[in-house]
């Protein structure tokens, strides 16, 4: 396969599909699996048939025991690549069109209780240089339901603190307005006082959250911050920044928020994505059985 096609595909993902750098890298990494298979079998991805692709799927998924989510991600990348080839007239027909996506098991997300989030907040050492920053990060993730990529990419020029909202650049460069909670606003204001004392590196001035060297935080840094706080707070769950987003949505729903409002706050295109938060907790199920089952009402 010619390098010119790969460069054109990269441009297509970046500009026409408006994908983030991380998403582009993921698509290209999965395409590399197809290229490796083709090299091993003397094939060219551009001229592959449906039967060739089926063999690739079997070889990659069945024999390696790849889980369903990984299968779906790789197939999505394959579909995207062949749509690009068809759209740009490199091929006359899409051989991936009949490849079926695996059925996805919908996982119930890990959610922290209000008490667990409070424990994480209390585990923050505010005497450390990064303490107030970390407190503001927790409040932003939990109080506004931001994705970790949205948090690290948050810019001061998109924050309207006097009006209590911020402009968020979501997936596919889609923008949405998100309210800033009073607590998040207060803690962010305190972080801004600390931020003034940093030596901010050129080109980093507009990023809301910086490390001690004045550079934009990375997603990996946020993961590390949260997991250390979780460990310090004695929380046994395996969490990520997305856990706070899940907790934000779940707690809103439990307290009566409309699902459509939650959908808008999270930036979900399809409400079926938001509907996963309608799951009932194990505690709620147990409470319902204890309250309503006749065997428990005899006592």
Regions found by a protein language model. Give the residues of each.
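Conserved catalytic core of the tyrosine transesterase superfamily
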Residues: 1-299
């Amino acid at each position: 396969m010619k390098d010119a096609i790969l460069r054109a595909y990269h441009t297509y993902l970046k500009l026409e599909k408006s994908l983030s750098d991380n998403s582009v890298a993921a698509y290209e990494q999965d395409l590399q699996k197809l290229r490796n298979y083709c090299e091993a079998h003397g094939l060219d991805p551009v001229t592959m048939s449906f039967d060739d692709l089926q063999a690739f799927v079997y070889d990659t998924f069945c024999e390696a025991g790849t889980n369903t989510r990984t299968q779906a991600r790789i197939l999505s990348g394959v579909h995207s690549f062949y749509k690009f080839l068809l759209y740009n007239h490199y091929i006359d027909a899409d051989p991936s069109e009949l490849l079926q996506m695996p059925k996805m098991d919908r996982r119930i997300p890990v959610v922290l209780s209000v008490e667990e989030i409070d424990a994480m907040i209390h585990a923050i050492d505010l005497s450390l240089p990064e303490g107030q920053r970390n407190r503001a990060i927790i409040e932003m993730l939990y109080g506004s339901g931001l994705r970790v990529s949205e948090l690290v990419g948050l810019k001061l020029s998109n924050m309207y603190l006097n009006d209590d909202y911020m402009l968020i650049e979501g997936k596919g460069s889609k923008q949405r307005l998100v309210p800033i909670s009073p607590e998040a606003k207060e803690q962010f204001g305190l972080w801004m006082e600390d931020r003034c004392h940093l030596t901010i590196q050129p080109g980093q001035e507009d990023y809301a959250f910086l490390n001690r060297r004045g550079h934009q935080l990375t997603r990996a840094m946020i993961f590390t911050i949260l997991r250390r706080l979780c460990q310090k707070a004695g929380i046994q769950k395996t969490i990520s920044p997305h856990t706070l987003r899940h907790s934000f949505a779940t707690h809103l729903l439990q307290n009566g928020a409309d699902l459509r409002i939650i959908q808008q706050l999270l930036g979900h295109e399809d409400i079926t994505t938001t509907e996963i938060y309608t799951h009932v907790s194990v505690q709620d199920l147990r409470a319902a059985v204890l309250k309503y089952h006749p065997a428990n009402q005899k006592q």
